[in-house]
Amino acid sequence: SEMCIRDSYLLIAFQRHIHGYSLLSRSKIFVMRKLKVTELNRLTPEAFKESKKIPLIVVLDHIRSLNNVGSVFRTSDAFRVEAIYLCGITACPPNAEIHKTALGAEETVDWEYFKDTPEAVDKLRQEGYTVCAVEQAEGSVMLDNLQLDKTKKYAIVMGNEVKGVQQNVVDNCDICIEIPQYGTKHSLNVSVTTGI
């Protein structure tokens, strides 16, 4: 086979055997180089604060792990989520353990603390949000079947690592969304679920 590099493309000649026939094919393969941080063109924290956000609020219902809280902040920053509501026992910034996982996203993503999750849900409903519990429940809609209205604002309630979303919160939500799972475990980590 012949190989030459031109304009950051690699030209490769290779033989392929399909159904007993030998075919000679030439393909361009892009040379993949990891980008440097300076090449990513990310927003500054100041520009992020002023940027347009997606109309989504993440509600954390009694999340006990500081690492999970930090991960949710980092994911929310990546997708420009409008805000995070921290409820009940969920820890709030500033916190060194949250910062360790969030890598500063707790300083860019807006957040608000509520003593009770139902109080946060009531506020969201009054402000016109469609509130969705992410939970395994009777009548839940599988994520791959979910139809969203792009003209609406949404809030997703993420439950405690052991008990999930409180039933009194589920009762006050517009819909339950369930992530299909095909293995042996009953649930996913809450920060992974938020990312999905």
Positions of predicted regions on the chain:
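Post-transcriptional modification and biogenesis factors for structured RNAs
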Residues: 13, 17-196
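Short, small-residue-biased leader/transition segments that mark boundaries at the very start
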Residues: 1-5
